[in-house]
A protein has these predicted regions:
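A generic, lipid-embedded transmembrane alpha helix
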Residues: 41-60
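Hydrophobic transmembrane alpha-helical segments in integral membrane proteins
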Residues: 1-16
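Juxtamembrane boundary at the C-terminal end of a transmembrane helix
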Residues: 172-194
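Juxtamembrane "helix-exit" motif on the non-cytosolic side of transmembrane helices
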Residues: 54-63, 114-123, 174-178
Length: 194
């Protein structure tokens, strides 16, 4: 028996929240203080890479259409690439700060995939609303990882980047399969689960 998709979303929301809190901690104290313990430098890039790995089983076992499978596959690949690029930068294997643009690409492609694979209108049901909201949030928030690549020491870019993951986790925690959004539920969506 498969768990409802909202349970899987909540698990990834927890991962995104941890990722955002690690990034927020680094943004608040600065990279010099954050990296006094060597393992902390690897924490958020490793978590991003691990979330990408965990998206593969979701793509394989929890999707019910080709467009969902492609979207989850794109998210898995880009999270792994962005996490690997950040790990390479931390380790010193990659020298150019332009590798940080991998996360910009991850945000843009993920946001676009969220918008493309949701076929219903904004107020059809809560999951439709959250797909649109999260998609546009990631597309607009792609400015933060881009700013991190251009100005690596920018506090605004680092804080905005961290808060993007926190906001995304809140959106994922709000997910329900069939639930009203702002009191509105399309009659075509079906009966709400709770």
């Amino acid at each position: 028996m498969q768990p409802p998709s909202e349970h899987v979303h909540w698990l990834f929301a927890t991962g995104f929240l941890l990722l955002g809190l690690c990034l927020l901690g680094e943004a608040l104290v600065g990279p010099e203080v954050w990296r006094r313990r060597a393992w902390r430098a690897y924490l958020w890039p490793g978590l991003a890479f691990a979330l990408g790995i965990f998206l593969w089983p979701v793509m394989t076992f929890y999707t019910n259409s080709a467009i969902h499978m492609l979207a989850h596959g794109a998210w898995a690949q880009l999270l792994m690439i962005a996490g690997a690029a950040e790990l390479g930068l931390v380790r010193g294997k990659l020298q150019s700060q332009w590798w940080r643009l991998a996360m910009t690409a991850a945000f843009l492609v993920s946001g676009t995939a969220l918008l493309v694979h949701e076929q219903n209108a904004w107020f059809f049901q809560r999951s439709s609303f959250l797909h649109h909201l999260m998609g546009w949030t990631l597309v607009v928030a792609a400015l933060f990882p881009f700013a991190r690549a251009v100005k690596p020491l920018s506090k605004v870019a680092a804080t905005g980047f961290a808060l993007t993951f926190v906001v995304a986790s809140v959106m994922l925690y709000s997910d329900r399969d069939v639930a009203p959004v702002f009191g509105h539920l399309s009659p075509l969506a079906g009966a709400p689960h709770r």
